[in-house]
Regions:
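Short glycine/acidic-rich loop motifs that flank beta-strands on beta-rich extracellular proteins
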Residues: 1-5, 26-35, 51-58, 72, ...
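Surface-exposed acidic, glycine/proline-enriched linker/cap segments
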Residues: 1-4, 64-93, 97-99
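Right-handed parallel beta-helix
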Residues: 1-30, 39-46
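Short, flexible loop/turn elements at secondary-structure junctions
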Residues: 11-15, 21, 34-36, 51, ...
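Solenoid scaffold repeats with emphasis on beta-solenoid/beta-helix
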Residues: 14-15, 20, 39-40, 45, ...
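Consensus "Asn ladder" position of solenoid repeat domains
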Residues: 20, 25, 40, 45, ...
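Active-site core of glycosidic bond-cleaving carbohydrate-active enzymes
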Residues: 94, 115-132, 138-149, 163-166, ...
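Leucine-rich repeat domain C-terminal region
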Residues: 189-193
Length: 199
C-alpha cells in the first residue's frame, strides 16, 4: 500500500507547515506518523485531491501508537483511569492545526487515528470528509466548519479529555463504539433538526 504523503513528520518537534497547496496524492497531504514529540503548527494550508489510490486515511492524517498505546480497548480504558498523564510522555507538546482548508473525497478531511493525542484543532474549513477522532487523548476541536459531513468519534476511551465544541456540522454525528463522550461535546451548530436530535 502506498504511504507517500505531501509532507511527512515522524519523531520530530516544533515543525511549522504554513501556506502550502498540497494536492494530487495517493495518500495524505500531511501525515504525522507518531505523536513523539509534537508541538507542530499547521496553518494556512489548502489540501485537496488526496487519498486517490488508497483508503482509510485523510487529507490530514496522524496516528499515535506511542508507548502508552495498546490495541485492546479494555486495557486502554483501565490504563487511562490509572495513568491519565502517561500520554504526554511522548506527545509532550500540543500540535496545533488551524486556519486550513481540507478536502478528501475518499476518506476524512482531518483524520486523527490510532492514539493520536494532544492536538488543538480550530478555525478549519472541512469541505467533504468531515473530521475523525479515534482512540486518543487530549484533543480539543473547536470553531471548525464541516460542509457535507460531520464529526466521526471512533472508539473513545474513558477519561479521554477530548473536547468537541463550537463547530458547525451539516450531517448528524457518526460515532462508532463510543461509550464515553469525552470531557465536553457541546454548543455545536447543526444545519438540520435531525442532526441535533441525534446528537
Amino acid at each position: 500500500e502506498k504511504q507517500g504523503a505531501g509532507i511527512q513528520l515522524s519523531m520530530s518537534a516544533r515543525i511549522t507547515i504554513r501556506n502550502n497547496s498540497i494536492y494530487d496524492l495517493p495518500r495524505a497531504g500531511i501525515n504525522v506518523s507518531e505523536g513523539t514529540w509534537g508541538g507542530h503548527l499547521i496553518e494556512g494550508n489548502d489540501v485537496f485531491d488526496t487519498v486517490l489510490e488508497t483508503g482509510d486515511h485523510g487529507s490530514f492524517n496522524s496516528w499515535g501508537r506511542d508507548r502508552y498505546w495498546h490495541p485492546d480497548r479494555n486495557v486502554m480504558d483501565e490504563f487511562a483511569k490509572e495513568h491519565p498523564q502517561m500520554v504526554f510522555r511522548d506527545a509532550t507538546e500540543t500540535t496545533v492545526i488551524r486556519n486550513n482548508r481540507w478536502r478528501c473525497d475518499h476518506g476524512w478531511d482531518i483524520d486523527l487515528d490510532d492514539g493520536s493525542s494532544n492536538y488543538h484543532i480550530y478555525n478549519n474549513l472541512c469541505l467533504h470528509g468531515g473530521l475523525k477522532l479515534r482512540e486518543g487523548f487530549a484533543r480539543t476541536v473547536e470553531n471548525n466548519i464541516m460542509v457535507n459531513n460531520t464529526f466521526h468519534p471512533h472508539v473513545w476511551f474513558a477519561n479521554s479529555q477530548d473536547i468537541f465544541r463550537h463547530n458547525i456540522v451539516t450531517t448528524p454525528y457518526r460515532p462508532i463504539q463510543v461509550k464515553e463522550w469525552g470531557k465536553e461535546t457541546d454548543t455545536n451548530f447543526f444545519v438540520t433538526k435531525q442532526g441535533l436530535e441525534q446528537a
